[in-house]
Amino acid sequence: HAGERGREVARMLRKLVERHDPKKNGLVTFGSNYMPWENTQKAAEEVEVVGYNYAEYLYDAHHKKYPNWIIYGSETASTVQSRGIYHFPFSQSMLANDDEQCSSLGNCTTSWGAKGTERCITDDRDARFCLGQFIWTGFDYIGEPTPYSTKNSYFGQIDTAGFAKDSFYIYQSAWTDYRKKPMIHILPYWDFNEGQLIDVRVFSNAPKIELFLNGESLGVAEIDHENGKKLSGDWQIPYRKGILKALAYDEKDQV
């Protein structure tokens, strides 16, 4: 669909779908990596729903240009993370260290994917005209190693053993209601070298988070899940032996 015959082929395929699915059990669509290209946009006129792969930055402009299009994120995210692995500092973006593992802090990105899980969530949330998104991926899988040359992918929010990674809880905090099912998640584990500077992140669907170390408050973070760009509480603290605890509060400051 990126070439000059793209629209012609898209029209032919749409007619075949309509012939074999006269009751319209499914909608005609495609998921494209080439939505910036004019020929692809022409081909998109032939389908009923238009899918964008890693192109959330085009949503607003294309919605203005093609207000009748029904659009969605057909493939998004491609953030990478290994469960229980943390590469500090959080402010340093990377793909992997020499251990060929990706950091679960949220600072490992691919060249084509979202610049972070929070960005993936907020771009979709703020495009009110968008149907939603298909995240790449729910589970890790064998193949497509990024970084190369490991056995499996790191894209999943759940690993191949079926355990949720930290990123799983960012989505949970954004997509659930604390008034019905409150949740809070803290990372990383708390066992490092004395004095080592550690990034601590907390995810919750509640509007306020407070972090404690050995009973001492380290501060409060307020989260605006409706309109805010920052969906986590973040602290950077020197490691001290003890108990790290996070509490979530509702709008009346009730735990």
Feature annotation, model-predicted:
Residues 1-225, 232-253:
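Extended substrate-binding grooves/exosites of carbohydrate-active enzymes
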